[in-house]
């Protein structure tokens, strides 16, 4: 049986990433699923991306909102009263983007918004967080019920749904469908 490690929302925390990757190595993980947000907030964006690149043969990664800001730009309304981000957050994103090499930016540009893979006969849907029709993250639900999970992922044909973004963990199972945050 294949061993899969799941990470998400690393946020440029190279120390935590190295600790997790060391544990993955000890237990001989075959694949690493990363649900995005490898950059942003933390102080080591370049080092974090480079460390993940060393594992790219094992890595299945999707784009989080922090990678989306790098690739598509920050929200346009940052200087008005309805802004979605504080000025400090904007400064952090700009600083993070300035610290990334072209090599790292090219690596990040390859991340899909979502991915469906099949492992051992199971379809696995991977996303940072389910998106609405505008491509933005739906309303955050920190500890979703099974009913909320079913609504979040309605219309997607998969056996296992893996996501992040909320910085919490949960596992729900119903009718042989697994929802892993």
Each predicted region: which residue ranges?
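Hydrophobic/aromatic beta-strand patches that form the interior of the parallel beta-sheet core
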Residues: 33, 60-62, 125, 160-162, ...
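Short, solvent-exposed loop/turn segments at secondary-structure junctions
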Residues: 41-42, 134, 170
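Histidine-centered catalytic micro-motifs
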Residues: 9-10, 126-131, 161-169
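Active-site-proximal segments of metal-dependent phosphoesterases and phosphodiesterases across multiple
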Residues: 83-87, 121-156
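Conserved beta-sheet core of the metallophosphoesterase superfamily
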Residues: 143-181
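Beta-strand-turn-beta hairpins that frame and shape the catalytic cleft
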Residues: 2-4, 116-125, 174-179
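Short, acidic/polar N-cap/turn motifs at the starts of alpha helices
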Residues: 112-116, 168-169
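Core catalytic region of metal-dependent phosphoesterases/phosphodiesterases
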Residues: 3-7, 12-109
């Amino acid at each position: 049986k294949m061993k899969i490690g799941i990470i998400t929302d690393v946020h440029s925390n190279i120390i935590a990433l190295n600790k997790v990757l060391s544990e993955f190595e000890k237990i001989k993980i075959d694949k690493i699923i990363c649900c995005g947000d490898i950059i942003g907030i933390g102080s080591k964006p370049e080092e974090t991306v480079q460390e993940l690149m060393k594992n790219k043969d094992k890595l299945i990664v999707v784009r989080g909102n922090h990678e989306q800001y790098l690739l598509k730009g920050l929200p346009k309304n940052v200087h008005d009263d309805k802004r979605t981000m504080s000025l400090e957050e904007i400064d952090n994103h700009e600083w993070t983007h300035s610290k990334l090499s072209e090599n790292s930016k090219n690596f990040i540009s390859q991340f899909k918004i979502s991915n469906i893979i099949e492992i051992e006969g199971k379809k696995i849907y991977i996303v940072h967080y389910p998106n609405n029709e505008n491509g933005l993250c739906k309303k955050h639900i920190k500890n979703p019920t099974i009913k909320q999970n079913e609504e979040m992922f309605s219309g997607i044909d998969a056996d296992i749904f893996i996501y992040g973004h909320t910085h919490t963990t949960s596992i729900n199972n119903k009718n042989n469908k697994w929802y892993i945050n």
